[in-house]
């Protein structure tokens, strides 16, 4: 089990990164909430991981905090929610927004996420309510503190902002026309890709 990596960030293209750990390159997929807290290329970083072994692949999912990883692990225990959908959920909204949806029984917001239909949203609301309650009690408030705060801080990129934003949304499950339309509508002069992705996602929720 690979639970934590410390190494140099070699590549990053939302939602994937490549880390050099003692000469070994690790490819990871990350939710955008974690991705945009990463340092610049060639800087050292620490990433908490969840390792998935399938018949056709071995996948690593990365998170900036142990708390966000814990929330990811709760999500994939929900019937009908796999790692890819859990990653999409945590990319489409912050942890605090997700918890807010659960507390308010806000099915309308959840079904706007790609891959989340009405039945899946209903299961999330029912199953995650009890799981989150147990998590908060077990952690004596530390997880609660996490999910009610967001340290999201976009950093500039040298790539085309609109192209990167569209590519990131498509990788999360949005259809190309929908991704292109939302990015074009959200774009303002001078926006970097991270800010643009956040604005485009918000416009669809």
UniProtKB/Swiss-Prot annotation:
Domain of life of the native organism: Bacteria
Region (Domain II): 65-143
Domain III, as annotated region: 157-205
Keywords for this protein: Cytoplasm, DNA damage, DNA recombination, DNA repair, DNA-binding
InterPro entries given in the database record: DNA_helicase_Holl-junc_RuvA_I (IPR013849), Hlx-hairpin-Hlx_DNA-bd_motif (IPR003583), NA-bd_OB-fold (IPR012340), RuvA (IPR000085), RuvA_2-like (IPR010994), RuvA_C (IPR011114), RuvA_C_sf (IPR036267)
Function: The RuvA-RuvB-RuvC complex processes Holliday junction (HJ) DNA during genetic recombination and DNA repair, while the RuvA-RuvB complex plays an important role in the rescue of blocked DNA replication forks via replication fork reversal (RFR). RuvA specifically binds to HJ cruciform DNA, conferring on it an open structure. The RuvB hexamer acts as an ATP-dependent pump, pulling dsDNA into and through the RuvAB complex. HJ branch migration allows RuvC to scan DNA until it finds its consensus sequence, where it cleaves and resolves the cruciform DNA.
Protein name: Holliday junction branch migration complex subunit RuvA
Organism of provenance: Shewanella sp. (strain W3-18-1)
């Amino acid at each position: 089990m690979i639970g934590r990596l410390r190494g140099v960030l070699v590549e990053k293209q939302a939602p994937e990164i490549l880390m050099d750990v003692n000469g070994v390159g690790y490819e990871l997929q990350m939710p955008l909430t974690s991705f945009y807290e990463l340092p610049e290329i060639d800087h050292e970083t620490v990433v908490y991981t969840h390792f998935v072994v399938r018949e056709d692949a071995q996948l690593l999912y990365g998170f900036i905090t142990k708390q966000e990883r814990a929330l990811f692990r709760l999500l994939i225990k929900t019937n009908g929610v796999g790692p890819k959908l859990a990653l999409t959920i945590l990319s489409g909204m912050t942890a605090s927004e997700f918890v807010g949806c659960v507390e308010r029984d806000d099915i309308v917001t959840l079904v706007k996420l790609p891959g989340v239909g009405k039945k899946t949203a209903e299961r999330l609301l029912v199953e995650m309510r009890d799981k989150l309650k147990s998590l908060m009690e077990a952690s004596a408030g530390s997880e609660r503190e996490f999910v009610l705060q967001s340290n999201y801080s976009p950093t500039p990129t040298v790539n085309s902002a609109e192209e990167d934003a569209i590519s990131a949304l498509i990788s999360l499950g949005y259809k190309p026309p929908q991704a292109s339309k939302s990015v074009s509508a959200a774009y303002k002069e001078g926006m970097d890709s991270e800010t643009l992705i956040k604005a485009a996602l918000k416009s669809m929720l």
